[in-house]
UniProtKB/Swiss-Prot annotation:
Function recorded in the entry: One of the three PilY1 homologs of X.fastidiosa, which are involved in bacterial twitching motility as component of the filamentous type IV pili (T4P).
Secretion signal, residue range per the UniProt entry: 1-35
SUPFAM superfamilies: Quinoprotein alcohol dehydrogenase-like (SSF50998)
GO molecular function annotations of the record: metal ion binding
Gene name, Swiss-Prot/TrEMBL: pilY1_2
Binding of Ca(2+), residues: 958, 960, 962, 964
Name of the molecule in the record: Type IV pilus biogenesis factor PilY1 homolog PD_0502
Family to which this protein belongs: Belongs to the PilY1 family.
Region described as Disordered: spans on this chain: 212-234
InterPro entries membership: PilY1_beta_prop_dom, Quinoprotein_ADH-like_sf
Main subcellular localisation: other
């Protein structure tokens, strides 16, 4: 394991180059807005405004509709039950001679008691009781998704109606009785008992007092309950019925929590579909309403679309939606928002179809009076396959959507809604996330008629379209999953071919788990080769747990399998065709929860239980929060704990998800033979109360709690807000008074690259002679067993420290400069902000009083003007050195580069950094800080405004590890040389980068080396910047430079030799380029204009630092592309050239031969650069494997030579850090 010892080798006396631990990591993303240099407050990668696709797959047969939602057969006062009624309201019943006008309505008085009961005199009913008594499973599903089925929906009035109970099946909805306190506080009856029935009564509830003699009164027709005529006194032997409808969103008596205000002045109940309507496009799939068991598949009910009054396509902006599903002023739902689809089905049926749309279908399936009950068979795998085909653009299966029989029978099969056969393409953007949210019970039937299956028991002739689909073999995929679940290969295949998976009963059953095979295939293999990148499908599923059947062991639940294998975090380099080993738990089980409390049944992250109404609502809300988090995913760059490809080598990847701005940190084992990555942990956290979170209070660290923050910028925060920042999620919600809903407690990680700090290397400094060098070996021995830690900054306002072995957070720190705007993070209307977004560095330094110490220095980057230092010698007892803001250091701006730790000739251990843009003076300055005291000196380089100094490169000209020279560029294109002599810093320009007279900004840290054969000092850097959207539109030419420092200012390009990009092409599927091979080197070095020989001037730029790798200088470029909304940061190249000529290498560097060997030549010349389709970050080398992390979170791995013969001192940190 590579530890802290490798981090500080930059100070070894026999290396002239003093470099940072980790290569610079700059994304085309940014932070604060200032009058000087504009810096965007959100990532500029692209795709952030692209809407996601959510297909709702409703496996609806009658148990899902008619089963009881609130499972407890005994009503318990004080327990809250879920349904259309407000548990915190009391109701009266409105009677009318017209049945459609009968409903419950809330009253202002009386108010409910503490146990949700009411004073029931005067005809009052308790809303909580009515939820328990009358709610069917599908009601809370509808309520959570759409706000509920509106049977009356006018501008000023909304009445909801419960689901139709179309069967007299008391086994699905038991007949219930209440008495005692439950009765007296729930219903307006002076009875000893209150007996009720729901089953078989449509939208009504029947109730009576007496059980009867030979005939149960509940089996006789009841009379409509009229509170003015039926006092329900003690001797009342009547049988009554109420229509279970409820008036909602009446502001005069108090609004329910899901009521949304409209410009009309009234309110409408809404659900998750409306809430996320600006960010998600929806479609719906279901079955035809046909009870014939040989009817296969599913049908498209509503095609993919926005459902709200506006569309939000990023390239168009906000526009009026021609297929809006509700009125923008009143919120009234439209019956037929997609008349074209309704008309097409009308033509096929011969009877008018007057309903369409996503919300309408979700509210009205099984509600329409077609004369037919809800279907009784559910071939769920075939239904899922229908959605699978939709996203793969394979087209409708005609046999699935055929309507047969009489006009009335066709109408019933259509369920009075469109059956869409002319499918469109649901994927509008290559970077869209595609998600399925399904609901159903596990007692499925006859769903095996799919590609690859030959067991046709209970199945009709396989449709031709299904036979033609060779993209998947469900039997092989299912056998593979069974192997991953622990079965032997032979047993797995036998199980995959079995006549039934978990439901084999006479006249039904013969089901499969092929839904899991389909979900796994769509989640791990590109569905659309015709589009750029991988188009994948993520599956979430809600199991309604029919009859309390949880399917234990849990691996016998097909929905659990589908959610696990269709929702796990796919590791980089994962091969879905060859993998048979179990998935790492870190990829699919991060919630720590179990199904029904069974510790052997771990709840997959995308699997939700709806065994009762309360759980269903919570499950759906959780599912949507995860879905939105997945909709816009991206990742930052990579880091490594080792330069060697050996056992224990680990790569760390930071990620962000722009749906809810959640972050994650993932650790991957690196295969020592192939370099393949296998995840073994995700960032995980203690309970929020137990987290160790600190902030700086004067010279010490204090707990980040409400009581300690009174003298900070967070003094006005509430305890709930501070607890939220600590990770408490109990106060999250969408109603007034609640805090923003998150899908995880860590904020997004964009520009802060993970920093690994392990144990020191005792072999360092064995020949050094500076103060303290002789004591280093003892310090290293003392610290040999300390816990390795990965540090990273996140945009939740914290530096996080994770145990590198487990991923568990052990410490977090909130810098003062992050506090002023941190409460915005808790706001429901939060728009992305940067907080702790800067780079980190760490080193071992010598303190003459305390000896050797390990220290970490961090910046806020785009998040603010701040800088902090911590003593991390003991990870269990991290201590404060200092925490500074621009109020302490006037020249400090948005520091966008890595701070450097170096020892200067006066014996001081210092922090060196460029001040960055937007300082008070708005100019470029070198900041030099005493690392132990925090005292800062500022060295201005010019008075020119709209400028800032970028990353610094320290250098030891005497080869003794003592820094006496620093190189840094600024945003106006000047490369500066700072020289330390006579205890003072002197500054002079080395070169000003220009193209045709226009300055080229330098935003990356330069790199230096000595050319051994000549002794000449070289400095390498590229130009360009990416701080705002304006920068992304800029197509000006940027360049790559190699300059010789001969002690004087280089007057211009005339004394530099020109290198050109001369050829571009494709080798083994990789975009590649070669550069020229100049024979004569300019007096002062070389330059290369980043101009494509085929595409011309594209604005290609170099905004991350160069690095050395063996015989090569490595540079990473980016080519913005504002024509592609999915990747505004564009693409780019990782290039490898001769550092001292700027030309191509004499031998191959990139191994592009997928079958082994080099394969690294284009038209006979060694390849100089390999293209990456998403903008690349600096590569990480582990052994001879180069891993390139891109803005979209993908990782490209390439082999490179295992060693190089470049005749220079060892200056690459990845070489220096070897023991």
């Amino acid at each position: 394991m590579v530890g802290m010892s490798r981090i500080i080798l930059n100070n070894l006396f026999f290396f002239r180059c003093v470099v940072a631990v980790f290569s610079a990591h700059s994304l085309v993303i940014s932070g604060a807005v200032h009058a000087g240099v504009q810096i965007s407050q959100s990532p500029l990668h692209g795709g952030g405004d692209v809407p996601g696709n959510l297909a709702i797959v409703a496996s609806i047969e009658f148990p899902t509709v008619i089963s009881v939602a609130n499972l407890a057969d005994t009503y318990t006062p004080g327990v809250r039950y879920v349904g259309y009624f407000d548990s915190n309201k009391c109701y009266k019943y409105h009677y009318s001679s017209r049945e459609l006008d009968r409903y419950f309505y809330p009253v202002a008085s009386p108010r409910p008691q503490a146990n949700y009961g009411c004073n029931t005199t005067g005809g009052v009913w308790a809303g909580n009781f009515l939820n328990w008594a009358a709610t069917q499973t599908i009601d809370p599903f509808r309520s959570a998704l759409t706000g509920g089925y509106r049977v009356r929906d006018t501008a000023n009035e909304t009445i909801l109606e419960k689901a139709v109970m179309d069967r007299a099946y008391p086994g699905n909805f038991p007949r219930r009785t209440i008495e005692g306190l439950a009765l007296t506080t729930s219903v307006p009856a002076q009875w000893l008992r209150f007996r009720m029935r729901i089953d078989g009564l449509g939208n009504r509830m029947r109730f009576t007092q007496f059980p009867g003699l030979s005939t149960d009164p509940l089996n006789t027709e009841g009379q409509p309950y009229d509170p003015s005529r039926h006092p329900l006194n003690s001797n009342d032997r009547g049988v009554y019925e109420v229509s279970v409808r409820v008036k909602v969103c009446d502001a005069s008596v108090g609004l329910e929590s899901n009521c949304v205000a409209y410009p009309s002045g009234f309110y409408k109940p809404e659900g998750l579909v409306q809430e996320y309507s600006k960010r998600v496009r929806y479609s719906v799939f279901s079955y035809k309403n046909d009870d014939y068991y040989l009817d296969d598949g599913g049908v498209l009910r509503a095609r993919q679309k926005f459902v709200g009054p506006k569309t939000y396509y990023p390239e168009q902006g906000e526009k009026t939606n021609p297929h809006a599903e509700w009125h923008p002023r009143t919120g009234v739902l439209y019956d037929n928002p997609n008349p074209e689809d309704a008309k097409a089905t009308t033509h096929r049926v011969g009877r008018t179809i007057g309903n369409s749309g996503v919300i309408n279908y979700l509210n009205k399936f099984s509600q329409m009076e077609t004369g037919k009950n809800t279907k009784g068979f559910d071939p769920v795998s075939e239904l899922y396959y229908t959605a699978y085909r939709y996203f793969k653009r394979l087209g409708n299966v005609p046999e699935y959507s055929v309507l047969t029989g009489s006009v009335n029978e066709k109408y019933q099969q259509a369920d009075a809604f469109p059956v869409i056969t002319d499918w469109d393409d649901p994927i509008r953007y290559a970077c869209q996330s595609n998600v399925v949210l399904g609901i159903g019970d596990t007692h499925t039937n006859f769903d095996k008629n799919l590609p690859g299956n030959t067991n046709t028991t209970g199945e009709p002739v396989k449709p031709q379209a299904v036979r033609n689909d060779r993209s998947i073999d469900v039997v092989k995929r299912m056998a593979q999953i069974f192997q991953m679940e622990g079965m032997r290969q032979q047993d797995a295949m036998t199980s995959a071919l079995a006549p039934s998976f978990n439901f084999l009963v006479p006249g039904a059953g013969n089901n499969s788990a092929y839904i899991a095979a389909l979900a796994y295939d769509a989640h791990t293999k590109d569905m659309r080769p015709d589009l750029e990148g991988d188009q994948l499908l993520t599956t979430h599923w809600v199991d309604v747990v029919e009859g309390g059947d949880y399917k234990i062991p849990i691996s016998t639940n097909q929905y659990w399998l589908a959610a696990k294998y269709g929702g796990f975090q796919v590791p980089a380099g994962y091969d879905p065709d060859k993998t048979v080993n179990p998935l790492s738990e870190a990829t699919w089980w991060t919630n720590g929860e179990y199904v029904n409390g069974d510790t052997k049944a771990k709840r997959a992250d995308n699997f939700y239980i709806a065994a009762d109404a309360e759980k269903m609502v919570a499950s759906l809300k959780h599912a949507f929060s995860r879905i939105v988090a997945e909709i816009k995913g991206a990742g930052t760059g990579l880091s490594s704990n080792s330069a060697r490809l050996e056992t224990g080598a680990v790569t760390y990847q930071a990620q962000f998800f722009s749906g809810t701005w959640r972050g994650d940190l993932i650790a991957y084992h690196v295969d020592k033979v192939t370099g393949a990555l296998t995840p073994f942990w995700n960032a995980n956290f203690p309970a929020w109360e137990q987290r160790v979170i600190k902030f700086a209070n004067a010279t010490t660290l204090q707990d980040f709690t409400k009581k300690n923050l009174g003298q900070t910028a967070l003094a006005s925060a509430s305890a709930q807000q501070i607890n939220y920042l600590r990770g408490d999620r109990s106060q999250e919600g969408n109603v007034p008074g609640k805090l923003r809903i998150r899908s995880g407690i860590m904020g997004d990680i964009v520009n802060s690259q993970p920093l690994y700090v392990g144990a020191p290397n005792g072999r360092l400094y064995t020949t050094a002679n500076f103060t303290g060098a002789s004591a280093y070996a003892a310090f290293a021995a003392q610290q040999a067993n300390r816990v390795p830690v990965v540090y990273v900054g996140a945009n939740d306002g914290m530096l996080h420290a994770f145990d590198a072995n487990t991923g568990k957070e052990i410490f977090a720190f909130v810098p003062r400069a992050a506090m002023p705007k941190l409460l915005e993070y808790t706001d429901q209307n939060y728009g992305h902000q940067y907080y702790v977004d800067g780079e980190l560095t760490a080193a071992d330094i010598y303190d003459t009083k305390l000896g050797w110490r390990s220290v970490l220095v961090g910046t806020l980057g785009r998040g603010g003007k701040g800088l902090f230092a911590l003593d991390v010698t003991d990870p269990s007892n991290i201590r404060l050195l200092w925490d500074k803001t621009s109020a302490d250091i006037g020249g400090l701006g948005n520091t966008l580069s890595k701070p450097m730790i170096a020892q200067t000739s006066d014996g001081t251990w210092s922090v060196l950094l460029g001040n960055g843009p937007n300082s008070t003076a708005d100019n470029a300055q070198l900041i030099v800080m005493n690392l132990l005291t925090g005292h800062a000196a500022q060295v201005p380089v010019s008075k020119t405004s709209n400028n800032g100094l970028s990353g610094v490169f320290p250098w030891s000209s005497q080869s003794n590890g003592i820094t006496d020279r620093v190189y840094a560029g600024d945003l106006l294109g000047t490369l500066w040389r700072f020289t330390f002599s006579d205890n003072a810093w002197k500054v002079a320009p080395l070169f000003t980068a220009t193209y045709q007279g226009k300055a080229q900004p330098i935003s990356a840290t330069p790199l230096g080396a000595i050319e051994r054969s000549t002794g000449r000092m070289w400095i390498f850097f590229g130009t360009g910047r990416a701080l705002s959207s304006h920068d992304m539109d800029n197509k000006e030419v940027q360049s790559w430079y190699g300059l010789i420092d001969q002690g004087t200012t280089i007057p211009g390009r005339t004394r530099l030799s020109q290198v050109q990009i001369v050829d571009e092409g494709v080798v083994n599927g990789y975009a590649v380029r070669t550069v020229s091979d100049p024979k004569n080197i300019g007096t002062d070095g070389w330059y290369m204009d980043l101009i494509s020989p085929k595409s011309g001037k594209q604005g290609e730029r170099m905004i991350v630092s160069n690095m050395f790798r063996g015989a090569a200088l490595i540079g990473t470029t980016r080519i913005p592309d504002n024509s592609d909304i999915c990747k505004l940061s564009g693409s780019g190249f990782v290039m490898a050239i001769n550092p001292f000529t700027g030309g191509r290498l004499g031998q191959w560097f990139f191994d592009l031969n997928t079958g082994g060997g080099s394969g690294g030549a284009l038209n006979g010349n060694p390849v100089s650069g390999v293209g990456v389709s998403s903008a690349p970050n600096s590569p990480v080398f582990t052994g001879n494997i180069m891993q390139i992390g891109a803005d979209d979170g993908t990782v490209t791995s390439l082999k490179t030579p295992s060693s190089g013969g470049l005749n220079i001192n060892r200056v690459s940190w990845r070489e220096i850090l070897r023991p």
